[in-house]
Amino acid sequence: MKQSTIALALLPLLFTPVTKARTPEMPVLENRAAQGDITAPGGARRLTGDQTAALRDSLSDKPAKNIILLIGDGMGDSEITAARNYAEGAGGFFKGIDALPLTGQYTHYALNKKTGKPDYVTDSAASATAWSTGVKTYNGALGVDIHEKDHPTILEMAKAAGLATGNVSTAELQDATPAALVAHVTSRKCYGPSATSEKCPGNALEKGGKGSITEQLLNARADVTLGGGAKTFAETATAGEWQGKTLREQAQARGYQLVSDAASLNSVTEANQQKPLLGLFADGNMPVRWLGPKATYHGNIDKPAVTCTPNPQRNDSVPTLAQMTDKAIELLSKNEKGFFLQVEGASIDKQDHAANPCGQIGETVDLDEAVQRALEFAKKEGNTLVIVTADHAHASQIVAPDTKAPGLTQALNTKDGAVMVMSYGNSEEDSQEHTGSQLRIAAYGPHAANVVGLTDQTDLFYTMKAALGLK
């Protein structure tokens, strides 16, 4: 069916005056598992009835009190499908990612810095800048346009309006997606003072700039910041008020509550501007959920299919993405004005780069559990916009079991008891590359209808800004 036909079909729903969404369970929208035996006629159907009324009931144009934005880094349709096939089966569904009632697709190109023309394959920095500021920029830039001009982020605007703010990631907190909310630098590589002096000197404190990503993160002072990246906090400030002190010492002196494991995170009962929370759970990126062999040349033919195994480094001392999401919501929801929270499942992308299907799939399952927590809160609270999307598409493909692919492959045993082959073949280098196909965006709650149809990544900024009534 053409997109124009779908859009026309939705027009009566989108223009029906609705001021308040109904909150009872809507199984026709939320339960999308196959109805029965997939070998029987109708058994693979996911619809249990007409969804027109349920879609209408899900619409709301009232202001949102809270927004929870969940990003699957590198989570294109292929990554979602592969994870669903493996973990839930072909007829299964994700209770978070697949349960949001309103779905669309968005474009996500970057810009060439010199020409201003489209760069059809974005990186995470330009991508996150697009939804956090509403401005297209060049690959590698954070919080600035192609002319290197700063633009305020949705987190900065929410904080200025008195809302609580949160920034959660399984990556280093200096990595592109979390950094885009709090930093304005000409290169995403400027994690700490030393790298900033070398790679983006105009941003360095000694040159009158705003400092490194980590220094700007501390200045942004989100109420809750959770992730990896502890290593950079050991660097010493080379200029400014905190010159000679490590960034960790600076955080402590400025009143941050520092936690480093699941138990200490669990013990925190409040986080606000007087006592912001900074959780650093790894020197670099946080450990992934599942392990398995990387794809190799003709790996699906020369090697047996495998089942992914738990990562022993992801023990009980390491909070999961769902646990970090839960704690962030618990703490931020104490602000009567509301909150903005971004949650990133970062290593879908990183494991896709590494051609590691088990790593990639496990991180997608992790994100789904975080989405479930966000939806549970939103349905109970009644005034929260939940959005789930990605920053860019990626390299993995599902191919036939006997394919002699020119790239790297690995066979997996799925929940169905069948074999699924993952293929990675868009780079001869050690790292696979991003791709430029449009991405899924789905939402629940006030203003969720604005993700329907074809939008651009920058539209997400304006949708969130309008939903929260930010100026």
UniProtKB/Swiss-Prot annotation:
Binding note for cofactor: Binds 1 Mg(2+) ion.
Subunit relationships: Isozymes 1 and 3 are a dimer of identical chains, isozyme 2 is a dimer of heterogeneous chains, one of each of the subunits from isozymes 1 and 3.
InterPro entries on file: Alkaline_phosphatase (IPR001952), Alkaline_phosphatase_AS (IPR018299), Alkaline_phosphatase_core_sf (IPR017850)
Compartments where located: Periplasm
Catalysed reaction equations from the record: a phosphate monoester + H2O = an alcohol + phosphate
Gene3D superfamilies: Alkaline Phosphatase, subunit A (3.40.720.10)
GO molecular function, one term: zinc ion binding
Residues reported in the UniProt entry to bind Zn(2+) 1: 349, 353, 434
Residue numbers binding Mg(2+): 73, 175, 177, 344
Assigned EC number: 3.1.3.1
Protein name, per record: Alkaline phosphatase
Repeat in keyword set: no
Residues in the signal sequence: 1-21
Residue numbers annotated as active site: 124 (phosphoserine intermediate)
Keyword terms of this UniProt record: Disulfide bond, Hydrolase, Magnesium, Metal-binding, Periplasm, Phosphoprotein, Signal, Zinc
Matches recorded under SUPFAM superfamilies: Alkaline phosphatase-like (SSF53649)
Domain of life: Bacteria
Cofactor: Mg(2+); Zn(2+)
Taxonomic path: Bacteria, Pseudomonadati, Pseudomonadota, Gammaproteobacteria, Enterobacterales
UniProt GO cellular component terms: outer membrane-bounded periplasmic space; periplasmic space
UniProt-listed PROSITE patterns: ALKALINE_PHOSPHATASE
Transmembrane intervals: none
Residues engaged in binding Zn(2+) 2: 73, 391-392
Family recorded in the similarity comment: Belongs to the alkaline phosphatase family.
Disulphide bridges: 190-200, 308-358
